[in-house]
Amino acid sequence: MYRRPLLISTLALAFATSLSTPAFAKDPKELVIGTSAGPYADQVKLGIKPILEKQGYKVKVVEFNDYIQPNFALAEGALDANAFQHIIYLTKFSTDNKLALSELIKVPTAPIAIYSKKHKSLNEVKEGTTVALPNDPTNQARALVLLDQLGWIKLRANIDPIRASEKDVTDNLKKIKLIPLEAAQLPRSLEDTDFSFVNGNFALASGLKLNEALAREKISANYQNLVAIRTADKSKPWVKDLEAAYRSKEFLEVTNKHFAGFSKPDYQQALEVTVK
């Protein structure tokens, strides 16, 4: 079982006191959506909330500063949906904590990438170079795979890339020093490390720009972020309305205007072809 950290967001702290209130006790036209701070909160505020409000919904966005509390809040009824994670993380977290949560729809996703405040090129790597990376298993695997692709390390042959860990590093080719940190702390680590892997949401929330990255992953479907809901809510009308909002032309326009460089889900790529 994961330990539940305190929420830093004042709004989230206040809202967490109502975790015992089941979602079905609320007006079904009042939706509470949890997100990580940064672009996924902005996607809801700028794109999804206006669409749903035109349909008569009241939408409240609760921002979290960690990857743990949003799923507990969703399972316990404090949230109706959340948007911050990919399917690998959702599946593992739900299994480990016996939560009945399901994917609703993929969302535009910012890639994990390598940033540096001390170096302008990856070619400056040398023996003893410090590299910070996420300490959670799924995102650490993404970082290790990219390091393998860059030729800085070598992973064990035939390793499942979504399960790669430090134990699978067979050769530290550049003799770098890996420093696992909580994902939210990685932007700050840039002051003290040579290079840091930073998840897209935390990068943008901290003021980093995607085009400043020295290397970016190519996002696969496994790492495309998603909207999660309680499995029991799958057939409810508001769920269909929420999904339709993400699939809309209006949200595609918001994505193109405000989230350039994000990897678009298949439905947005298909819609883009039809509207051109």
Which sequence ranges carry the predicted segments?
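Ligand-binding "clamshell"
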Residues: 92-104, 118-119, 190-192, 197, ...
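A conserved helix-loop-strand patch within extracytoplasmic ligand-binding domains
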Residues: 104-154, 252
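Short, well-ordered beta-strand elements
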Residues: 27-38, 57-63, 130-131
